[in-house]
Amino acid sequence: MEEFTTRAQLLDVVRRLRADLDAAVAEAGAERAVQPGGFDELSFKDVIAHLTGWRLVTAARLEASMRDEEPVFPWPEHLEEGVDLHAINRWFYETNRDKPLEQILAESNETFDRVERAIATLPEDALLTPGRFDWISWSDHGLGPAVVRGAMDHYRVEHEPDIRAWLQQG
């Protein structure tokens, strides 16, 4: 497992994730990206919106740490991240399903920008020190490595194989 111990490594991972997703979007093309059914009942656009929603959580965590606050997540307050995963994913879908692809892609890019900006500006102590924030009870790593690892694994393990298979189907 790749270890992230520097700001430069974290930024590199985020930039590689962006480049890989951008390449998949370019390969798919706009017409194919919005067709339902490529991912169960979902379109590639829906998958991008899902990834964007969770990247928004990454941005919220990083930005909250800049204010030394706990993060506030985009979904309704009654939903809990560790408990209501399917409901949160459904909320992401319902919130984004009627948006045009161009808006979904713009929001995706904005979340990447926010994550990169936060990683670039957070003090190293806040970014890399394990145990610095009490609300990161789900990881033994510092905030930066924890959230970047989560974003990377979410894409690479849970979604990239399906995206690659779908792209190969042409």
Please place each PLM-identified region on the residue numbering:
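Extreme N-terminal tail/first-helix region
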Residues: 1-19
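Short, contiguous alpha-helical
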Residues: 34-87, 127-170
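Acidic/His metal-coordination segments adjacent to aromatic residues that form catalytic metal sites
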Residues: 2-6, 88-103, 137-146
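Structural signal for well-ordered, non-membrane alpha-helices
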Residues: 18, 22-29, 56-63, 109-123, ...
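Hydrophobic/aromatic residues within well-ordered alpha-helical segments
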Residues: 14-17, 51, 108-111, 152-155
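Acidic/histidine-rich alpha-helical segments that form the ligand environment
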Residues: 83-129
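Residues that form generic nucleotide/phosphate-binding pockets
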Residues: 13, 24, 65, 91, ...
